[in-house]
Amino acid sequence: HTFHALSQYHKIDTFNKEKQNYVPVYEHGYNLKKTHQLVIGAKRVVWKDYIFPQTLHNKQFILHEMAKDTNNLVVLNHPAVRSGYDVNDLKLLHYYDHIELLNPSAQSFAHWDTALTAGKKIFVVGNDDNHNIFNDNAIGRFTTLIFGAASDSKKMIDRMKKGQSVAVWLPQIHNETLESKRSKLLNLHSLISGISLIDSMLAINLSKSVAEIRVIGHHGKLKLKQRNISSLTFPFSQNDAYLRVELYLEDGTKLYLNPIFRDIAEGNQGRNLIATNYISRDRTNPLMESFALASMIGIFVSVRNVKKRKNMRIKDMNIDTTGMSLG
């Protein structure tokens, strides 16, 4: 099945809503730094946002508001664009499910590996972020393939939450038809024969050889690179809580698989449980931020009062001096 999600800013588009493959979605964010989110399976629009550059807790508040609907899927859009999300933010933020890894404007690998290294179960999507549906060159390059039978949006979202998907980057071929791109994507569905984790050993099997397979570990470190192969096995080290795989095809197509976690039970946790488990590890505190703001206001008021008293003393001195000279 093919799912088309037409996202607009702060509006859930209802075009084709009677179709089985309709996905309610909208893009959130009208701020200067493009700190945007994509809400897939949205039932309502969260209108609140912070227009000026956001603090970590501004960002966390917005994500928490979106995550109150436990059936939706929250994606951090193009985090590398305008540093809408700083890489270090991803060590601490919770209540989201995916990162938009592939985008025409920026790719956010450092953000993804930072979140994974911090112990967050975060998956990825590819997105054309196209604002002109009549430009075939800009459609179908960055996509998300979902594996398994998903005949409606609810099942699709469920599979995405389980990481049963892959982000795809098709090479740029000028004037390539949409049908040609569709054919390539359909063929990719059968490429991955199986991925397993047995006795701390990652195994991947493909239906045909690819130009290159890379295995990535903590902090985005390259653990293994092999060329012209159709299968490999790789052991988890004591320092790796996750491993992820990248596939490079001869025609330039790139596939970014979602991570495999050493602890399968942890890999199956939902965003709310993950937030509960890790929130105590956060090095920041909303109360401290409020205290800091209050302190700044207090200092500002104190400075104004000092200046006011100083001006009054100067004014009093001028009056006294004038009075004496007149005397």
Locate each region found by the language model.
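A metal-dependent hydrolase metal-coordination microenvironment
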Residues: 1-79, 84-87, 91-94, 100-118, ...
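C-terminal functional module detector
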Residues: 130-327
